[in-house]
Amino acid sequence: ELTIYYCIDDLASSSPQAKRIRQSETRLLREADLVFVTSEKLRERAARVRHDVHRFPFGVNFTEFEQARHAATDPQDLKDLTGPIVGYVGGIRKEIDQELLRDVATRVPEATFVMVGPLQADCSRLRMPNMVFLGQRRHEEMPQYIRRFQVGIIPYLLNEYTAHIYPA
């Protein structure tokens, strides 16, 4: 029997219980048989406790993306969009830099900003004519959405928590 720790985020950096989380994580890092992390920053942090930390980023199904490149049809909710599409895929949470997004969307009114993912924060400030929130879509549909993006963005705030998110 093995104990495997797979760390995907720096949870302590965004929690009022940071000290307690860090103590628990240090104990887990010491006691686990194997440790995997999703980003280089997480690996560096975990390596302060133990040297044998393995970076194991999230995977991509390249076959699905290749098939999407040659798809004849677009997702129904993107069919009527004209002009360039600036897109984001992921949870629309408090880590999104809404001020930056609003500023860029205002400066580039000819582009449509498409946000694909569950709405997990108040984004009322982003209700603009060229900002579209599609909600969550199935994982296997993502290549078809991303194929339509002229620009892909990851509009995170810059802080301790987002510094450890993969991709970063």
Place the predicted regions along the sequence by residue.
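Membrane-proximal helix-turn-helix segments that form the acceptor-binding/catalytic region
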Residues: 18-35
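Conserved donor-binding/catalytic core segment of Leloir-type glycosyltransferases
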Residues: 77-96, 102-105, 113
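A short helix/loop element that forms part of the nucleotide-sugar donor recognition site in Leloir-type
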Residues: 66-80
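Glycosyltransferase donor-sugar binding loop
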Residues: 112-123
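A short, active-site helix/loop in glycosyltransferases that binds the activated sugar's phosphate group
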Residues: 32-55
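Nucleotide-sugar-dependent
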Residues: 140, 144, 154-168
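Carbohydrate-associated surface elements
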Residues: 41, 59-62, 68
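Nucleotide-activated donor-binding/catalytic signature segment of Leloir-type glycosyltransferases, i.e.
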Residues: 122-144
